[in-house]
């Protein structure tokens, strides 16, 4: 379920957040968020950043998109707003994010940049994070599909930022996650099985 919020905190003005569950039941739930930086009296900000699991620092949107294989600014913006003609009013909202990507214009540099904020500090480690930790419900090596979903999250957030959509009402039953009995029993069994293993090996 995608949750879009406004007035997040002093650092971020808007965010789009999702809990992503892999089809592989052995893998834990991963949480990811796309956020817009709040303007300050001295800086206009409003660049878009992404919180990626196992990456210590929020990654600028355009750098993450390049790491996923989309290189040009136009291709990245089209992935986010889909129709450049119909949604041309949104294009200017990406200007701070274009500048935020700095001098990183290709995939290799993007992967190297992200690697500096990971434990492994290598490109293979970053690729492992993008495969297994970023939006695992989409699949492991489906980088193009992950970029499209990331673009969808960004567009939903921008529409709330422009007042074209309301933020998600988390109290509404429409947005409540219903856990099925099988899932609940699996989680309970896993918890007690882990405890039993600890007692056995003590």
Each predicted region: which residue ranges?
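N-terminal non-catalytic structural scaffold regions of very large proteins
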Residues: 1-202
């Amino acid at each position: 379920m995608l949750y879009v919020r406004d007035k997040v905190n002093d650092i971020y003005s808007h965010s789009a957040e999702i809990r992503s569950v892999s089809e592989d039941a052995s893998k834990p739930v991963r949480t990811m968020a796309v956020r817009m930086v709040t303007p300050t009296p001295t800086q206009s900000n409003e660049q878009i950043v992404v919180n990626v699991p196992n990456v210590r620092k929020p990654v600028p949107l355009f750098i993450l998109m390049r790491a996923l294989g989309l290189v040009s600014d136009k291709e990245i913006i089209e992935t986010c707003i889909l129709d450049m003609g119909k949604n041309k009013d949104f294009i200017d909202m990406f200007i701070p994010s274009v500048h935020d990507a700095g001098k990183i214009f290709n995939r290799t540099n993007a992967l190297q940049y992200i690697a500096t904020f990971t434990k492994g500090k290598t490109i293979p480690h970053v690729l492992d994070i993008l495969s297994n930790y970023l939006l695992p419900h989409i699949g492991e090596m489906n980088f193009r599909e992950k970029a499209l979903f990331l673009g969808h999250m960004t567009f939903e957030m921008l529409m709330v930022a422009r007042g074209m959509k309301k933020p998600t009402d988390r109290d509404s039953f429409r947005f409540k996650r219903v856990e099925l009995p099988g899932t609940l029993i699996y989680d309970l069994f896993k918890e007690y099985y882990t405890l039993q293993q600890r007692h056995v090996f003590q």
